[in-house]
UniProtKB/Swiss-Prot annotation:
A Pfam family reported for this protein in Swiss-Prot or TrEMBL: RrnaAD
Superkingdom, natural source: Bacteria
Gene: rsmA
The UniProt record lists the keyword RNA-binding: yes
Native source species: Maricaulis maris (strain MCS10) (Caulobacter maris)
Key words of the record: Cytoplasm, Methyltransferase, RNA-binding, rRNA processing, S-adenosyl-L-methionine, Transferase
Reaction(s) catalysed (UniProt annotation): adenosine(1518)/adenosine(1519) in 16S rRNA + 4 S-adenosyl-L-methionine = N(6)-dimethyladenosine(1518)/N(6)-dimethyladenosine(1519) in 16S rRNA + 4 S-adenosyl-L-homocysteine + 4 H(+)
Record-given protein name: Ribosomal RNA small subunit methyltransferase A
Length: 289
């Protein structure tokens, strides 16, 4: 049996009794035209090791393999799907490996040891999508050449937002300090089974050249959590907590970064937050010298 001879996904769900679990944030994308579009966003995968989180019954899984990925590692917590995924593995000629476990705990680099670039493609579970993105952005060095990720539309907007946008915040600053990010596809709720209450969207992230990547993600997280946690306050007030953790004052950080203490976080560009993170790190390290 080949991939195009596999039974329709609805039949697979029925025969294996694979109803979606709300506790896992599961919403299945069954439209094979849409899954093919998503898989193609990864580009040529003929020499790549792909990874997918939360494959479920295997809609996107089939598309990734059909688009020619050299191999695919699927990380799935829900053991109910293992039988359906094994059928896909057989149909793909043994190119699929399934790792049962929590994707937040999995060390992908220990599992993806073969040749070729690594690429991430996932319809991310709604309840852990942001955490997984931060995990992958924190990796040093970034081990993947591209990530094609589906989020709730609200989260996708936050990843690609620009200064002044309503959605601009911590996620945009951290993502765009490490990658180029753009919104590639909008997916209506009706495309899923069961349909979620919100729309979804696919974001494509390409790591910036090594020299342009901001490395100190921990400092950037501290600064952005503080600044956007009180986004209606001026930076002088919103940065007070983070500054105290670094053993300095908000005014000192802002002066070092060349920023106006009366501004709010929403108008500060990516470079400005990186300057604040550098100033915070310098103060933090000096206090422990």
């Amino acid at each position: 049996m080949s991939l195009d001879q596999l039974p329709p996904l609805r039949d697979v769900i029925a025969s294996h009794d694979l109803g979606a679990k709300k506790s896992f944030g599961q919403h299945f994308l069954l439209d094979l035209n849409l899954t093919a579009k998503i898989a193609r966003l990864a580009g040529d995968m003929s020499r790549d090791q792909a990874i997918e989180v939360g494959p479920g019954p295997g809609g996107l899984t089939r598309a990734i393999l059909a688009e020619g990925a050299a191999s695919l590692l699927a990380v799935e917590m829900d053991s109910r799907f293992l039988g359906a995924l094994d059928e896909i593995n057989v149909a793909s000629g043994g190119r699929l490996t399934v790792e049962q476990g929590d994707a937040l705990e999995v060390d992908e680099t220990a599992l993806l040891t073969g040749p070729g670039d690594k690429v991430i493609l996932s319809n991310l579970p709604y309840n852990v999508g942001t955490q997984l993105l931060i995990k992958w952005l924190q990796a040093e060095p970034i081990w993947w050449r591209r990530a094609v990720l589906m989020f709730q539309r609200e989260v996708a907007d936050r990843v690609v937002a620009q200064p002044g946008d309503k959605a601009y915040g911590r996620l945009a600053v951290i993502s765009q300090s490490r990658c180029q990010a753009h919104l590639a596809l909008k997916i209506p709720a009706r495309a899923f089974t069961p349909p979620p209450k919100v729309e979804s969207a696919v974001v494509v992230l390409d790591p910036l050249p090594e020299a342009q990547q901001f490395k100190d993600v921990v400092a950037l997280e501290r600064i952005t959590a503080s600044a956007f946690g009180q986004r209606r306050k001026t930076l002088r007030r919103s940065l007070a907590q983070a500054a105290g953790q670094g053993g300095t004052s908000a005014d000192a950080l802002l002066e070092e970064a060349g920023l106006n203490a009366g501004d709010r976080a929403e108008v500060i560009d990516i470079t400005g937050f990186q300057s604040l993170a550098r100033a915070w790190r310098a103060a933090y390290d000096a206090g422990r010298a």
